[in-house]
Structures are given as structure tokens and as C-alpha cells.
């Protein structure tokens, strides 16, 4: 039995070798220039879902009530300071005779 000489390259001739190498180089360029197909961006954030407008409105109303009460308290303290905090301790009550 005679052995068939094996080629060191799998190509039978140079034209086939060039075609294989060109195809391989084209494949490598495509792999190198490939763009990802998976969308890795975070989802859009909708402001009307993140901001609770009803809650903000309720908080604003609560703060306006607090501001009004603070203003009234300030007026009372200012009037007390103006009169030096004096109170009328006199009792002008006259007893009735029965």
C-alpha cells in the first residue's frame, strides 16, 4: 500500500487558497465592525409618573396653612411686645345684692 502524500495546507491550488483567505478576511472585518443588537439603554423616565403632582399640591397647601398660622402667631407676639405683655388684671365686677 502506497501512502498518499499529504499537503501541509488544505488547499489544492493557490487560487483556492486566495479565495479562502479573502473570505476569511471579509469575515474578520464583519466581526470587527459588528454593532450590538441588544438595546442596553435604560428605559425612558416619564416625569408625570415620577412626580406625584397631587402630593406636591397637598404639600404646598399644607405649607401655606403653616405660613398663615405662623404669620398670625407673629402678629400676636408683636402686639404682646407692643403692650409690654401687660394684662388687664382688674376685676370691675360689682356684686349684686339679692
Swiss-Prot record:
- Expression across tissues: Expressed in a number of tissues including brain, thymus, lung, heart, liver, spleen, kidney and testis.
Which InterPro entries does the annotation name? CFAP97D1/2, Hmw/CFAP97
- Any one Pfam family here would be Hmw_CFAP97
Similarity comment:
Belongs to the CFAP97 family.
Protein's UniProt name: Uncharacterized protein CFAP97D2
Protein source organism: Mus musculus
Q: Gene encoding this chain?
A: Cfap97d2
Amino acid at each position: 500500500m502506497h501512502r498518499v502524500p499529504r499537503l501541509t495546507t488544505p488547499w489544492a491550488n493557490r487560487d483556492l487558497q486566495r479565495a479562502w483567505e479573502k473570505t476569511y478576511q471579509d469575515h474578520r472585518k464583519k466581526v470587527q465592525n459588528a454593532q450590538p443588537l441588544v438595546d442596553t439603554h435604560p428605559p425612558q423616565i416619564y416625569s408625570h409618573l415620577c412626580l406625584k403632582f397631587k402630593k406636591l399640591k397637598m404639600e404646598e397647601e399644607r405649607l401655606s396653612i403653616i405660613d398663615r398660622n405662623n404669620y398670625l402667631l407673629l402678629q400676636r407676639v408683636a402686639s404682646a411686645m407692643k403692650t409690654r405683655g401687660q394684662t388687664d388684671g382688674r376685676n370691675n365686677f360689682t356684686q349684686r345684692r339679692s
